[in-house]
Regions:
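The feature captures the beta-strand-to-loop junction immediately N-terminal to the Walker
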Residues: 37-39
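Conserved ABC transporter NBD signature motif
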Residues: 60-68, 77
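A short, flexible loop at the N-terminus of ABC-type nucleotide-binding domains that lies
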Residues: 1-7, 11-23, 71-73, 91
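Helix-to-loop junction immediately C-terminal to a conserved catalytic motif
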Residues: 52
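Catalytic Walker B motif of ABC-type/P-loop ATPase nucleotide-binding domains
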Residues: 164-168
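Conserved ABC ATPase signature
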Residues: 139-143
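ABC ATPase nucleotide-binding domains
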Residues: 239-254
Length: 254
């Protein structure tokens, strides 16, 4: 087992408030789908913002691919880690192809950007792997919610094939598109070996599509284990402060 992300003794607090994370230790396995699970306010979104260098932590160590996070420039980090946030602004009158090409924009001279041959190859690769080739000339504001989510995943894929973080990727989708997106995530992981980190609110999705789950409660990891070891009513009830029932391998009430 090789860990692609190692977090040791991490402390983080907002302004002068009490620490959200204190001596947090997390390891994320390379090439696996790992889901962060827990109720609102437990630290899931904060953790991915730290990994993206959108928030600075107070102390401790965060290593990605063996290198300290603070040693990465934003451009270097973007080449190995991409994030699809829960809420994204959708521009009007722009094609799917142009939208995905934005992922290849450098951090300088963006107004003079012209795709290189390598950029074009990665854009076409991302469109192919997300089944968007037939839509590449279509305007993004004409797409369904599920198709649009594929565009955002394609953008992440065009940016990085090392680590992709998905923040609630199915929240605003109906059941049909939820299953389609989760199957796409699994296919990308299995076919390309991409390390995928997800934040999910749906426990059944986490149990069905994750290799590993990290359970966070009040800024602490209470369990980091294979998903198959999370079919535990006592654990889930503690995690969500709810009356959760599991039947035939699924959460049926909570």
């Amino acid at each position: 087992m090789e860990n692609i992300i190692e977090i040791n003794n991490l402390t983080f607090k907002y302004d002068n408030k009490n620490a959200l994370f204190e001596d947090l230790n997390v390891s994320i396995e390379k090439g696996k789908i790992t889901t962060l699970l827990g109720k609102n306010g437990c630290g899931k979104s904060t953790l991915i913002k730290i990994l993206a260098k959108n928030l600075n932590y107070n102390s401790g160590s965060v290593k990605i691919e063996g290198k300290e996070l603070n040693s990465y420039s934003l451009k270097e980090l973007a080449s190995i880690l991409a994030i699809v946030y829960q809420k994204n602004e959708t521009p009007r009158e722009i094609t799917v192809y142009d939208m995905v090409s934005f992922a290849r924009l450098p951090y300088q001279n963006i107004f003079f950007y012209k795709p290189t041959a390598s950029d074009v190859e990665k854009i076409e690769f991302a469109l192919e792997k997300t089944n968007l080739q037939a839509y590449k000339d279509k305007r993004v504001d004409e797409l369904s919610g599920g198709q649009l989510q594929r565009v955002y995943i394609a953008m992440a894929l065009a940016q990085s094939t090392d680590i992709i973080i998905l923040d609630e990727p199915t929240t605003f989708l109906d059941i049909k598109y939820q299953k389609s997106i989760m199957q796409l995530v699994r296919d990308l992981n299995k076919s390309l070996g991409i390390t995928i980190i997800m934040v999910l609110h749906d426990i059944n999705q986490a149990l069905a599509y994750s290799d590993n789950i990290i359970a966070l409660l009040d800024g602490k990891v209470i369990k980091n284990d294979q998903a198959s070891n999370f079919f535990d009513e006592t654990l889930l009830n503690r995690l969500y402060d709810a009356d959760i029932k599991i039947e035939d391998g699924k959460v049926i009430s909570w």
